[in-house]
Amino acid sequence: RQRHPDCDKPPDTKRCTGHNPAFYYNPRRKNCERFSYGGCGGNGNHFKTKQLCHCHCHEND
């Protein structure tokens, strides 16, 4: 599976509709980490679950 093109972008933490728990891929740590997604806009580097984040962004060494 090809990696999501936004996996290397920083998480968008600006507030919009609230605090939505989500996960983003941290390319420096090569791991999915929790953050608070503001609910609108941003980029594709936000996922509802850690499993989805890992599936779309994990790098196979």
From Swiss-Prot:
Q: Which UniProt keywords apply?
A: Disulfide bond, Ion channel impairing toxin, Neurotoxin, Potassium channel impairing toxin, Presynaptic neurotoxin, Secreted, Toxin, Voltage-gated potassium channel impairing toxin
Q: Which residues form a coiled coil?
A: none
Disulfide linkages recorded for this protein, renumbered to the chain, are C7-C57, C16-C40, C32-C53
The record's section on InterPro entries has: Kunitz_BPTI (IPR002223), Kunitz_BPTI_sf (IPR036880), Prtase_inh_Kunz-CS (IPR020901), TFPI/VKTCI-like (IPR050098)
Q: What is its main location?
A: secreted
Q: Which residues form the BPTI/Kunitz inhibitor domain?
A: 7-57
Domain of life, per lineage: Eukaryota
| One cellular-component annotation, GO | extracellular space
| A Pfam entry, by short name | Kunitz_BPTI
Q: Which GO terms describe its molecular function?
A: potassium channel regulator activity; serine-type endopeptidase inhibitor activity; toxin activity
Name the SUPFAM superfamilies on file.
Answer: BPTI-like (SSF57362)
Q: Where can this protein be found?
A: Secreted
User: Tissue-wise, where is it found?
Assistant: Expressed by the venom gland.
Kindly state the subunit structure of this protein.
Heterodimer; disulfide-linked. The A chains have phospholipase A2 activity and the B chains show homology with the basic protease inhibitors.
What family is this? Belongs to the venom Kunitz-type family.
Q: What role does this protein play?
A: Beta-bungarotoxins are presynaptic neurotoxins of the venom. The B chain is homologous to venom basic protease inhibitors but has no protease inhibitor activity and blocks voltage-gated potassium channels (Kv).
Name this polypeptide is given = Kunitz-type serine protease inhibitor homolog beta-bungarotoxin B5-B chain
